[in-house]
Amino acid sequence: MKKVMVVYDGTEASRLLYERMTAQVRQQGLEAQVVCHDIKRDSESGLSRGSGISEFRGRIDDLAAHVADVDLLLVHLAPVSHEIIEAAPRLRFIASERSSVPNIDVACAKEHGIAVSY
């Protein structure tokens, strides 16, 4: 069974993403999980510092602690850095609700054979 995680980052867009995707995921018989993120920007999560990402909300360490068994990751503003990708050995697909992905380390995802959609 595939596991889908929809990350809630405190925004209306992520709430709607959760509602729409959770309904679709459940119709397919998949397990869905919501992770609530701290929406505050702080010096650790708001700056790139070579992590391959910028402009995001939430703590990298918080999400990394919950992705080990996730196959599909759906985000809006939540960070998807190399730390998160490396903590998710089953991850095969990342989808973003945004029109660009400054919050996703696309190069790292490619290196790990993970598709990214936005």
Language-model region placement:
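Phosphate/diphosphate ligand-binding glycine-rich loop within oxidoreductases
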Residues: 8, 71-118
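N-terminal glycine-/charge-rich "phosphate-binding" loop or analogous flexible N-terminal tail
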Residues: 1-70
